[in-house]
Amino acid sequence: MYRPFLEHLQQKLQSSFDLQSLTIPAGLDYRISERGRESTTIRSWCYTCSELRKIRYTYIDGGEHAQVFNSVIYPAHRYDLPLLGIDLLAFGKKKNLIVLDFQPLFRDKAYLARYIEPMRILRERYGDVAQDVEMKFYDANQYFSKYLLFARTDAETVAGRVFTAYCDYLDLYWQLLASAAPLGDAQDIRRIVKAQKDYDQYSADRDPASGLFSSYFGHEWAERFLYEFLFEDAVPLAVGQPGR
């Protein structure tokens, strides 16, 4: 269901940036699970370029039972842009969950006006798709914006209206990146480094997909995937908190 979304992202990245592959730790780039009624595969890609220090995306194909496309794009540390976050999930034929967002690293008014306010027009344009629902796993006060596109919808809407919204969100993100002024001060850059590390730690500690990975591929593999690939700058709680 979400293959066109993956392919569109790949095409945009390849045509716009000088991509270099980043090594994914052994055994984490591809895996097959025979649990359940049919096999499920997970495959990941990871790249870098001068403007974007880490581009990662993952596709889970469980046939009619599960289709998941997840991506996070981290700007280079000399840019203070939000991260681009994509979560598209389908379980069965009727359960489709969509989350598209520019995930802010900071919450001050100037930052939000510069990077988040431009999203308003898209959120309003796709108000027929977006929903104001309780987001159990998405804290609007931490790394999520008030203009994120969050929706539970049907397959027809995903293929039509949601895909159009997705393309527009990506286009806006590329525009913000193209117009962003690189940081020159070492202290400012260190602030970005810390903010991106904090994002990884926050996300790894709360990632709602951890249980999904464990159910298909086992707990040990899921923990490696979480801390060695998805959020590699995070420290596992057992390591980061002595005495636990």
Curated annotation (Swiss-Prot):
Enzyme Commission no: 1.3.7.2
Cross-referenced InterPro entries: DiHydbiliverdin_OxRdtase, Ferredoxin-dep_bilin_Rdtase
Keywords, comma-separated and alphabetical: Oxidoreductase
GO terms of biological process kind: phytochromobilin biosynthetic process
GO MF, one example: 15,16-dihydrobiliverdin:ferredoxin oxidoreductase activity
Transmembrane segments: none
Catalytic activity: 15,16-dihydrobiliverdin + oxidized 2[4Fe-4S]-[ferredoxin] = biliverdin IXalpha + reduced 2[4Fe-4S]-[ferredoxin] + 2 H(+)
HAMAP family: PebA
Family: Belongs to the HY2 family.
Function of the protein: Catalyzes the two-electron reduction of biliverdin IX-alpha at the C15 methine bridge.
Protein name per UniProt: 15,16-dihydrobiliverdin:ferredoxin oxidoreductase
The species this protein was found in: Gloeobacter violaceus (strain ATCC 29082 / PCC 7421)
